């Protein structure tokens, strides 16, 4: 969550200085691409297949976000792991690009805004009754449970 607004150009340090808190999140994707296989250009044009986001608790610190480890569990089984480096080298790197693109449109990131910086692990299917949980640095957890499909 941004504590300060960001406009025009900002480097990685300026982006991080504007961030008040970083949160454990799960991105829910809804891809039109079979098997979640696509070209980068197509996925970008499709809004990155983003459907929803589950925002969990704040991480203890915004320092060294590129080193924060995450383990993803799908129905209790580990399905992937990564560090913040999986987001273009650093989670704030995409925000540097976003700030520049918004400035071209006369817009900016406002204080209070939350920006999702991209998935760190591969996507997993989320079927009825599934539970997906991410554990950040062995402590901070966020989970989503998809309820059963109603019957008629």
Regions found by a protein language model. Give the residues of each.
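Charged, cofactor-coupling segments
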Residues: 124-130, 134-152
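A conserved acidic, glycine/proline-rich C-terminal tail/linker
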Residues: 91-126
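Short strand-turn-strand beta-turns centered on an Asx-Gly dipeptide
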Residues: 74-75, 117, 137
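Short, surface-exposed, charged/polar-biased interaction segments
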Residues: 36-43, 119, 130-133
């Amino acid at each position: 969550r941004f504590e300060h607004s960001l406009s025009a150009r900002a480097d990685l340090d300026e982006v991080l200085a504007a961030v008040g808190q970083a949160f454990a999140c799960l991105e829910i994707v809804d891809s039109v691409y079979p098997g979640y296989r696509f070209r980068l250009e197509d996925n970008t044009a499709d809004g990155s297949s983003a459907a929803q986001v589950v925002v969990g608790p704040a991480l203890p610190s915004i320092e060294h976000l590129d080193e924060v480890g995450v383990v993803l569990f799908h129905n209790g089984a580990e399905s992937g792991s990564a560090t913040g480096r999986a987001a273009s080298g650093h989670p704030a790197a995409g925000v540097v690009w976003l700030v520049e693109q918004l400035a071209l449109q006369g817009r900016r990131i406002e204080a209070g805004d939350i920006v999702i910086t991209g998935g760190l692990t591969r996507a997993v299917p989320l079927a009825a009754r599934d539970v997906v949980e991410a554990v950040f640095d062995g402590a901070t957890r966020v989970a989503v449970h998809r309820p059963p499909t109603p019957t008629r």
